């Protein structure tokens, strides 16, 4: 029997496993991406930590190297080298050179001075290069009366810092000048002041400005000339040293002041009046060694002993 029409039967097959497979693939893809994301982040963090650690290590090494270099820079000269320098300097044929004992007194103070040590020297002498060498870790400045010699010396020794100054005094006028300064001790010649603006007859006010700003640890007075009545004498250099020492604003409150040729009348007179006997700690051959402390800005007396004497004698007057 034949059927009367075409009947097409269509079958729709549903494969549920395909949908499940797609979901599973997405999960695997998500897991894969997440894994690599976490791995990337961990790698980035590790790299950053490594860079920071490397920088810190480099900084530590650099700091250690700098510290070692600094320590080496401020190291002192060997004792044997210093003794050799003093020995040969004292053996000079120059009749105006210092003795071994005098140079050693100054050398010992420079060795104990904490670097950087500030050394001020009045006068270019036979020992100039010695002082510069002994204070190789600090600053050394020289003050010279002869401008031509100062320029010549600086030309052949460019490492030397020297300034010329014009002295207006005469050694034969020492007592009159000292008396005038004592009378003006409460005004223009007071012991604590900025000499750059001073009108005191014995104050040096024409040095470079920065010289007055330095806190000098050691001052050596070995100039200007003082071996005659018409030479400048050392009244101004001793007075200036006394004021600089007492007017310090920082650093070590004590200043070592050395005066050479202390046997002469002018050096002894000015030493007693401005540096004071109570501050004299040593006298070696022709060299006097004082230790001065900075004073209050309102001070009007260079020496404490004189103030006491006046207070004792006033009741009996």
UniProtKB/Swiss-Prot annotation:
GO terms for cellular component: Golgi apparatus; Golgi membrane. It is a single-pass membrane protein. Keywords: Golgi apparatus, Membrane, Transmembrane, Transmembrane helix. Disruption phenotype: No visible phenotype; due to redundancy with IRX15-L. Irx15 and irx15-l double mutants have a mild collapsed xylem phenotype, irregular secondary cell wall margins in fiber cells, uneven distribution of xylan in the cell wall and a lower degree of xylan polymerization, but no visible growth phenotype. Expressed in roots, rosette leaves, stems and siliques. Expressed in the xylem. One of its GO terms (biological process) is xylan biosynthetic process. It is found in: Golgi apparatus membrane. Pfam families: IRX15_IRX15L_GXM. Required for xylan biosynthesis, but not directly involved in catalyzing the addition of sugars to the growing polymer. PANTHER family: OS11G0490100 PROTEIN. This is Protein IRX15-LIKE. The gene is IRX15-L.
């Amino acid at each position: 029997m034949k059927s009367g029409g075409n009947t097409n039967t269509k079958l729709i097959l549903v494969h549920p496993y395909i949908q499940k497979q797609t979901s599973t693939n997405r999960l695997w893809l998500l897991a894969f991406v997440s894994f690599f994301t976490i791995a990337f982040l961990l790698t980035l963090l590790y790299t950053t930590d490594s860079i920071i650690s490397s920088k810190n290590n480099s900084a530590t090494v650099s700091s250690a190297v700098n510290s070692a270099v600094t320590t080496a820079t401020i190291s002192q000269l060997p004792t044997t080298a210093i003794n050799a320098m003093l020995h040969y300097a004292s053996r000079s044929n120059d009749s105006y050179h210092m003795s071994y004992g005098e140079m050693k007194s100054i050398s010992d103070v420079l060795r104990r001075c904490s670097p950087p040590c500030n050394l001020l020297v009045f006068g270019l002498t036979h020992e100039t290069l010695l002082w510069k060498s002994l204070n190789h870790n600090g600053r050394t400045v020289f003050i010279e009366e002869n401008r031509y010699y100062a320029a010549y010396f600086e030309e052949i020794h460019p490492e030397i810092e020297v300034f010329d100054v014009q002295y207006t005094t005469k050694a034969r006028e020492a007592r009159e000048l000292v008396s005038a300064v004592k009378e003006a001790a409460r005004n223009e010649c007071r012991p604590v002041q900025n000499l750059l603006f001073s009108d005191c007859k014995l104050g040096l006010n024409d040095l470079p400005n920065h010289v007055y700003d330095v806190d000098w640890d050691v001052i050596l007075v070995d100039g200007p000339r003082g071996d005659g009545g018409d030479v400048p004498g050392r009244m101004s250099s001793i007075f200036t040293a006394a004021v600089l020492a007492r007017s310090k604003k920082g650093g070590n409150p004590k200043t070592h002041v050395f005066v050479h040729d202390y046997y002469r009348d002018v050096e002894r007179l000015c030493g007693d009046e401005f540096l004071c006997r109570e501050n004299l700690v040593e006298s070696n051959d022709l060299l006097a060694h004082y230790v001065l402390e900075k004073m209050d800005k309102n001070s009007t007396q260079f020496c404490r002993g004189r103030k006491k004497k006046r207070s004792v004698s006033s009741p009996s007057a």
